[in-house]
Every structure is written in structure tokens, then in C-alpha cells.
């Protein structure tokens, strides 16, 4: 919570869980909360993260658009992270890496990094601004440093890498875990800014049409007017 707030989140709605089995109920509770833009959880278990992904997707379909940010386990390799992203494979899920260092300088999971990234996403009001280059505050360091070839692999594999250079921790590039559609490679939703722009445009367009065409009949003239209004709004 502290890291999310420190990096830009204006408020945090938290639900406590006793163990891994309690996450689904927590996600269900949060799914009905309005004005939630980013979701995080305190687990690196892939099954729990899939539940978080599904919660974000279902809430978004119900016009409560949101992004989920997850993390890898302690000491996960590049291959492990790419495999995790492949399992999640959704435009509403961001997998942040590497792991963080704790206060004693020991290697830990990526949960702290994910919380900081979530705060940075929540704090950016312009959806078109890329996440890459965003400075992450409050971290004690990173558990790994990626070479350029590894950064390329991670980004193409749906992982959002973070680096520590010159005493500053920053996001290299913000991407989603969506890399395939069916069995085919698909880069349509790779950039995080793509889904964020969609989430910004669609609600605004929906509100404008609702206000202008309240109780309008489904006629050819009305449909033409709606098309014209959509073009105008875009």
C-alpha cells in the first residue's frame, strides 16, 4: 500500500486475506467498487494471478475498467517470467520484473516492484503517456540486472522490465502480457498505453452518446446521427 501511494496512487482500497484461498472472495469484493483503476495482490502464485486477471476482465466488461499488475516469485529467471506471462496472456495484466531487494539487501519477490508500478500507472492521468521512463520510488534496489538481450526477450514475451541505473529505479517499457491470440502471435495489445487509451475513450464516448441520444429510437436516421457523433468525439 505504501509503495502504491508513494508512486502516484491517490487512494488504495484493500481487502485482507488469511491465505491463498481467500483471494477470490477479495477480488469479488473489489469487483463491485467504483473508481478502481489498478489491481494488485500479495501473491506470486500463478493460479491466484489468473483469478486476479479474470476479475479485472470481468469488471472491465461491466464498465469498471481496470488493469491488474502482478509479480514473479523470488529469483525467477527470464525464461520463468516469460512462461508466467504466457500463462496470463491478457491485455489487462502487467507482469513487472525483476524481484526487489528487502531492507537488508536480500533478494525478494517482485511484489514490491509490482506495487510501485501499479502506483505509477494509477498516478498517470494521461493514458497516452508511455510507462517507460517512469521513476519508481521507495524501493531498496532490484534483485537482478538484465542485459540488453534479456530486456528484448522480456518485452517481446509480455514482461514489463524495471532497471536500476545511477541510483534511480525506472520502468524500461510498459507492456501487457497479451502476446498471442489463440496460437498466433499478436502484438496489437503489447503496449500498455493501448488498453489505457481504450479505457479512456470508451467511457467518455459512452457518456456522450447516452447524454445526446437518451431514449432515441433505433432508426436509420438515429444510427446515422450516432455514427456522426462517434466520429466527432474521436
PLM feature spans:
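Surface-exposed assembly/interface segments
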Residues: 1-234
Amino acid at each position: 500500500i505504501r509503495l502504491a501511494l508513494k508512486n502516484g496512487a491517490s487512494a488504495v482500497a484493500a481487502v485482507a486475506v488469511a491465505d491463498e484461498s481467500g483471494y477470490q472472495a477479495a477480488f469479488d469484493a473489489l469487483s463491485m467498487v467504483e473508481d478502481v483503476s489498478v489491481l494488485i495482490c500479495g501473491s506470486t502464485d500463478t493460479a491466484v494471478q489468473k483469478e486476479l486477471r479474470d476479475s479485472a476482465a470481468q469488471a472491465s466488461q461491466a464498465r469498471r475498467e481496470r488493469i491488474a499488475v502482478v509479480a514473479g516469485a523470488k529469483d525467477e529467471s527470464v525464461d520463468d517470467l516469460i512462461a508466467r506471462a504466457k500463462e496470463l496472456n491478457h491485455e489487462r495484466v502487467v507482469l513487472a520484473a525483476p524481484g526487489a531487494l528487502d531492507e537488508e539487501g536480500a533478494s525478494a519477490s517482485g511484489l514490491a516492484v509490482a506495487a510501485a508500478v501499479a502506483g505509477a500507472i494509477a498516478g498517470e492521468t494521461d493514458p497516452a503517456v508511455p510507462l517507460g521512463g517512469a521513476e519508481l520510488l521507495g524501493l531498496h534496489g532490484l534483485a537482478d540486472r538484465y542485459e540488453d538481450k534479456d530486456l528484448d526477450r522480456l518485452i517481446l514475451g509480455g514482461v514489463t522490465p524495471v532497471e536500476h541505473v545511477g541510483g534511480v529505479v525506472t520502468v524500461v517499457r510498459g507492456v501487457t502480457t497479451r502476446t498471442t491470440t489463440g496460437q498466433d502471435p499478436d502484438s496489437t495489445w503489447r503496449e500498455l498505453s493501448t488498453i489505457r487509451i481504450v479505457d479512456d475513450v470508451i467511457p467518455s464516448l459512452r457518456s456522450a452518446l447516452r447524454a445526446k441520444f437518451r431514449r432515441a429510437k433505433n432508426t436509420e436516421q438515429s444510427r446515422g446521427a450516432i455514427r456522426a457523433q462517434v466520429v466527432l468525439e474521436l
